[in-house]
Amino acid sequence: MLLVLLRVLSWIRNVQDRIPIAVRIPRSWWLRKRLTQQESSQLLMGSAINKEAVAADKEPTTNGVVTDHSVVYKVYPARWLVLAVCCFLALSNAMQWISFSSLSDEVQMYYRGRPANGSMDVSLVTNQIFQFVAVFTGFGGMYITDNKGIKTAGLLGTSLNVIGASIRMIASIPFIESHLVRETLLHAGSFIAASAQAFFLVLPSKIAECWFPGDQRAIANVLSFVANPAGVALGTIVPSVLFKNYTHGNASRWMFFSFTLGMEFLAFFPFILALFVRSKLPPTPPSASSAAHQNNIGFVKSILQCLLNVQFFIQMTLFAFAFSLLWSLMIFLDGPLKDQGYNMAGYPTAVCAVVGTMTSLLAGHIADKTRKFKEIIRVCTVGFSCSVITLRMFLSEPTTGPLDPIVVYILCGCLGAFSIPQFPIGVELGVETTFPVMEATSSGVLVIFGSLFMFIIPFVQTYTESMRLFYAQSWKFALDVTCGLSLISVVLSLFFLKPRYRRLELENAKSALSPEEPVVTARTAASDIEMR
């Protein structure tokens, strides 16, 4: 009897070993709760990774299906709707952030009623609110995005953005006579709108990982991040054209209301789109790394794991320099340009943003095809440093001819071309380095660190300008400091940036998994499905 039983068990074992892991139920099923219908369907849809198909998402997509051997991964058209929500949210929010930078005098008189006279003007306070809020709300955005899902994060981000835009619009109504009330409402609306950054700045990497296959992740990140400089371009060009002949008085008292009303309509569009997002993530994962990604590390532990990773800390510094040096320089540059005889309004910032958007798309395509993330970062840091040093040297002398503004535009375009691609590529590299830390957490740490630098650098520029060292024109030393910081980023990228691509290692490996080892992935664990 015992011999018969042993033969039966041996036969069962031989049959089980022939069943692919992707469809095999673990042997210890009788010791566990029975699989629900949802878990079973997810298991059968290819959420597991088997020995022969770890690198499934290396294959290009065909008709929405990514296949390799017995595992099937799938992409859905709805991914473009999810991406559009993030893109238009970023564009709208960036426009609200930068819209008053080129109108500092007009904004000062309309909202405060008197010149700044050495104090912080209204436009600078509005800009700094966005950086300050991004630092302190970023952790909440990271937690909600990773634990409540993309749909919830998108709804919260678009709601905060449209509410903030509405309050800013109310603040611009001419019937409000008190300048104190106007300025208070403006800053309150800016505070609420700035809170939306906590979501859309960490959503790109999450959307790319959960909805897009391996050969589209970098471009998905790029599209999300270039929406930000596109918003910056709109936020500088539109007010420069709209307020070209503006004079403070009754004749133009509705100009600010019309401008903020337009930004309100733009903020309302992504909110409507977010209402059509029906699920947190697709039923079938688009890639092997997405299928294997489990949220079982813990939020605090994930942050510590990022901060204690030396390579990630180097990437944090590079990302912070790229983000803060570019935008703080473009805001600061208005003074030196006027001092040297240029009358260019906000157009250098717009040129910087437009050129940076185009080069980011190119960099994203190259990254998707070659996976050379660190090489792109190195080229960008060197190019940015050369551009800012050249601009500093060129502005040493006042303008002397009609070609000088063209040179300034070219140099500003180079600043954007070499700095803006570092945002999406840097986030993608951060996810690779910290895998399997959840995407919103790793990208959120990068963004928070960048926002912190963006909050500090303008004060550093203002302080160094007030020191009046070495030069009769104090802004020259402030630009020298910017050049020095850009050189630090060059040294870090060339000699210390040596990341390990952990996510690609998972996707490319033909790992020697035991054929008897059960595999439970992110999509087969009910709790993790709920979290993501």
Regions found by a protein language model. Name each.
Residues 100-101, 309-356, 457:
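Extracytoplasmic gate region of multi-pass secondary transporters
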Residues 137-150, 359-372:
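Helix-to-loop junctions at the C-terminal end of transmembrane segments
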Residues 257-276, 477-495:
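Symmetry-related core transmembrane helices of the 12-TM Major Facilitator Superfamily/SLC fold
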Residues 218-244, 447-457:
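Glycine-rich segments within core transmembrane alpha-helices of 12-TM secondary carriers
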Residues 374-425:
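C-terminal transmembrane helical hairpin of 12-TM major facilitator-type secondary transporters
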Residues 2-8, 19, 26-95:
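Cytosolic juxtamembrane N-terminal segment immediately preceding the first transmembrane helix
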Residues 191-226:
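Cytoplasmic helix-loop-helix junction between adjacent transmembrane helices
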Residues 147-158, 368-382:
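Cytoplasmic membrane-interface "Motif A"-like loop-to-helix N-cap segments
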